[in-house]
Amino acid sequence: MRKIIFLAFLFCAFLQMSNAQSSTEKNKSMPVLRHVVLFKFVDKATPADIKKIEEAFRALPGQINLIKDFEWGVNNSPEKLNDGLTHCFFVTFSSTNDRDTYLVHPAHKAFVEILKPYLEKATVIDYWAHK
């Protein structure tokens, strides 16, 4: 009886490992589209104005379900090569169609209207991530 229980345990452990490996391989093979947005704000933009913009951008993943992942941050590089760009927003999509739909989505368009009065420069780069 102990032998049967032990073998059943080994079988379950093997299945668990097999499923985990299969899931990991699946994730590795599925490329994602990164949408990187960098902002430089006009001199008249106050900390409150910038905070409003940060909050509006951070709200987009809750309003647009096509966003697969989202990160953001403020430049802290000691290299001083940012050319005035201070904020980076990193948005991940599963497809170009998802990205294209996001760009014309009413929530994204509303965000752009909040941003416009305070934006001096934007740099946007989209790429397919390679591992």
Specify the residue positions occupied by each region the protein language model found.
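Short S/T/G/P-rich N-terminal loop/turn motif that feeds into the first structured element of a domain
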Residues: 16-85, 94-101, 127-131
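Amphipathic alpha-helical protein-protein interaction surfaces
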Residues: 46, 104-108, 120
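A common structural junction motif
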Residues: 58-61, 109-112, 119
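Bacterial Sec-dependent N-terminal signal peptides
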Residues: 1-25
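C-terminal structural segments of small proteins and small subunits
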Residues: 99-102, 107-109, 113-115
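Alpha-helical structural signal
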Residues: 34-35, 87, 108, 115
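C-terminal partner/receptor-binding element of secreted or periplasmic proteins
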Residues: 118-124, 131
